[in-house]
Regions:
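N-terminal leader/linker segments that precede catalytic domains of diphosphate-processing enzymes
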Residues: 1-80, 87-101, 105, 109-117, ...
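Short, glycine/charged-enriched secondary-structure capping and boundary segments
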Residues: 81-83, 130-131, 150, 171
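NUDIX/MutT-family hydrolases
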Residues: 147-188
Length: 213
């Protein structure tokens, strides 16, 4: 599908009800499901963050989804694949401001160049105690990305067709900073394993797109 057709169809996503936990659970590790169950009725004070789920055309007008591999550092999300985004700062007016600011800082896309389509369902990440708000956006006339090398190891430009292909969903055995030898559902895209909160966000997005494409 070319980007022009995609933009026409995705505009209708605003009218669809969000799927939330129902879709998140499909790509959630079993340990995550247990953790979320334990905190469901607690009054935990969560940190806030936001990410931008960005679609754009490549040089052939093919639709791509932007992911990035984070650098290795001392933290639970070290060397993981995710969306541009990060924690709320005092200068941010709201969570959308956070997502736009972080997207500019991490991959060099100006806020004014992003058409924000809608929010997706927020998701809580127990290991880091962040509640993350995803936003869906379009980058119509992309310039070359400029990565923040201190945080971003590389960009992963995923063709829409690969993202939508169910054959690219796998079960992967992983060891993380907080769990060892666990089997997790994941997307295998461009040679990278995408799991955890990012995969859970993508699960909802994919279910919504299936209703439109």
């Amino acid at each position: 599908m070319n980007f022009d057709d995609f933009t026409k169809r995705i505009s209708k996503i605003k009218n669809l009800p969000l799927l939330g936990e129902e879709s998140h659970i499909k790509m959630a590790p079993s340990i995550r499901i247990e953790e979320l169950g334990k905190i469901k009725n607690t009054t935990l004070v969560k940190k806030k963050a936001a990410v931008m789920v960005l679609f754009y055309p490549d040089k052939n007008n093919v639709v791509r989804l932007l992911l990035m591999l984070r650098n290795t550092y001392k933290g639970v999300h070290s060397n993981q694949v995710g969306f541009p985004g990060g924690k709320v700062e005092k200068i941010d007016k709201n969570l959308l401001d956070t997502a736009l600011r972080e997207t500019f800082e991490e991959v060099g896309v100006p806020s004014k160049s992003i058409e924000t389509i809608r929010e997706l369902s927020s998701i809580y990440i127990p290991p880091s105690n962040f509640e993350v708000q995803p936003y869906l956006g379009l980058y119509h006339n992309p310039l070359p990305f400029v990565i923040e090398e201190a945080e971003v190891a590389s960009l992963i430009e995923v063709p829409l067709l690969d993202f939508m292909n169910d054959k690219n969903i796998i079960i992967k055995n992983l060891s993380t900073s907080y769990a060892t030898n666990i089997d997790v559902p994941a997307f295998k895209l461009n040679g990278y394993v995408v799991w955890g909160a990012t995969a859970m966000i993508m699960s909802e997005l994919k279910e919504l797109l299936k209703q439109l494409l």
